[in-house]
């Protein structure tokens, strides 16, 4: 229900009071200190003073307030309020813990520009610098309008960019305040996402597994009748094994160590400060493993990561892409296990779609020849690399290589940490963490979903980052339950013929057998119930 005018006015008044009270308090606290440092780069002296940019600078206040009345329902309004308040509290805390000031004099101004600058000086002081609350709020407020008014996204983006530029050209902030403010804004959007639940709110038990499987089960069972064969109660009972939980923590510690090491070069200052972005990125990944929560990556139903997760994780995503390129070099990206069940890397999906499923074989061949001429350069670009042909001996020798003309009606994506390329066919996602054994719940759900997609669409590709681990576990579970394999050894032997590089750690094998056992029991119980009826 759309919030009433009275409710919107009340919330705006309360948030506004918090803003001015906390902002003023931190300003006066910094003013009371004997010494407040200033951080500025020498090149900033070349930044021009553009008096007219005080207009976009001030416009953020209007957009900030107007958004309260554009909210379509109470939930959207409460999310907007939560984002504003979170940014305000975090920024004010930083202002008081690490006070900075802007000491450069502003050139004299008159007319409308001068009046706007005088109005700003009336309540503002040259403190409250890093992180720039203006930058953080421009991202948060801009995200609201971006979602609310999709038809005018380009003007919104341009205006918000002008607002961000204005913090420098009005001599309100030094450059160091801009990336720190952006970090705050994106962190708030990540913590309070537009879709799904905040990664900080997901409840998890002492065994370490968050209830992602139960939530996904409730959603997935509406898409296939076969999901009703597994009781929701059984999903609540199974937990992550202590060995898997221990491995998650070890991986988290490694990423935290990487985050700490990445931050060290920033002590040299200058361009080395950008290494803090790498540190933040690895810290987010560490948080995912520390909580055992694949939802930290915020992979959406269409396979994309949220904008906030993409920005925060960008250095890590580049590393993931390079890692995929290295391990898949000279190897087939996809392979056929059965006529209707395929396995492979998430990067192989784009290759199939753009080279076969969309354009056709002749057009694709011509395109590949053209791309091959500049492949040496393009392979260094992660966003383009997966469109390139992979000519290798191992691919030619693969027992069931996926031909470029093959159709791909359905994709089951179990890769949590990397976005899926835009796909025109049927696509489903069940994000699982890399390098740890999937839970029994996850494998039960994935096998059910794989079978449902196979029955509905005839052919399914199960993919993860490389097509060696998580996707292999899902396909092995399916082979045991629906593929006619008598035991895990037979299923593994069959899968290795198609995907020789697959890996099967002991903990994953245990989870596969447990999941297959539960599914077989459910199938048997379902069959007995049908006979009795």
What feature does the model see in each segment?
Residues 113-120, 325-381, 385-390, 394-462, ...:
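Cysteine-based protein phosphatase catalytic domain of the PTP/DSP
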Residues 20-21, 88-96, 159-171, 258-264, ...:
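Aromatic-anchored segments of alpha-helical transmembrane domains
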Residues 137-138, 173-193, 309:
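Alpha-helical transmembrane segments that form the membrane-embedded catalytic/substrate-binding core
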Residues 196, 208, 241-321, 325, ...:
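PTP/DSP superfamily signal
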Residues 1-4, 197-214, 221-224, 229-232, ...:
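Membrane-interfacial, low-structure loops and terminal tails that flank and connect transmembrane helices
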Residues 30-43, 70-154, 160, 164, ...:
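Membrane-interface loops
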Residues 61-67, 136-143, 159-166, 255-263:
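Hydrophobic, membrane-inserted alpha-helices
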